[in-house]
Design a protein with these regions (language model features):
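ABC family nucleotide-binding domain
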Residues: 1-187, 191
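Conserved beta-strand-loop-alpha-helix hinge in the C-terminal portion
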Residues: 195-220
């Protein structure tokens, strides 16, 4: 597989179960090692990073959003978001400023003092999104981020992704098997049997028009993919 991601792009990676999309994400995140080939980010081959260099790369350059939120139950929403900055030794005043700015962007100011068990699934995922974005990473990796959400919460999260992409120039790489979710991206890469199958760009199309284009490819691709509008 060979493709490029430009700074500020919002890309969805689609494919049936077992197609290799999550493995691809794991390789880009350096959680899995590649057996061959190279992965470049900002001019550096990240497959060659080891030890402290690798830890620093993950901490400073990547943001992660998972299907199951992965929030710490003993911390409030504010503390969960702030943790990523505390690890980087950001001053407390700056942490407070950045957490509140991100919370305002994602409309979660009202839950900052709440613990995960006090929040809805959609709120928890937006807190997780804020945690991933607050460090201003070079790349945000999202693995099935809407998988545990109802349709309303999923739509709100995806609209938040679009806002962050547009206003903060956030670079987002999102794995999904859902055409509705993918239709919020600006580009969709389709993978089949570990290989690049097709690629679509949204251009000036509406979200619904792009959804229809995605569904045309899904029909050709086959496999276990969702068809919700």
């Amino acid at each position: 597989i060979s493709f490029e991601v430009e700074k500020g792009e919002f890309i969805a990676i689609m494919g049936a179960s077992g197609s290799g999309k999550t493995t691809l994400l794991n390789c880009i995140s350096t959680l899995d090692k590649v057996s061959s080939g190279k992965i470049y980010m900002e001019g550096d081959d990240i497959t060659r990073l080891k030890g402290n260099q690798l830890n620093r790369f993950r901490r400073e350059k990547l943001g992660f959003i998972f299907q199951e939120f992965n929030l710490l139950d003993t911390l409030t929403a504010f503390e969960n978001i702030a943790l990523a900055l505390s690890i980087q030794n950001v001053p407390a005043v700056e942490i407070t400023k950045r957490v509140h700015a991100m919370a305002e962007e994602l409309d979660i100011e009202s839950v900052l003092s709440k613990y995960p068990y006090e929040m809805s699934g959609g709120q928890k995922q937006r807190v997780a999104c804020a945690r991933a974005m607050v460090t201003d990473p070079g790349l945000v990796l999202a693995d099935e981020p809407t998988g545990a959400l109802d349709s309303r919460s999923a739509r709100m999260l995806l609209e938040s992704f679009q806002t962050l992409n547009r206003e903060m120039q956030a670079t987002i790489l999102m794995v999904t098997h859902d055409a509705f979710t993918a239709s919020y991206a600006g580009r969709v890469i389709f993978i089949k049997d570990g290989k690049l199958f097709h690629e679509l760009r949204k251009g000036n199309a509406s979200r619904r028009e792009f959804f229809d284009q995605i569904m045309d490819v899904v029909t050709l691709l086959g496999g276990d993919l969702n068809h919700a509008i």
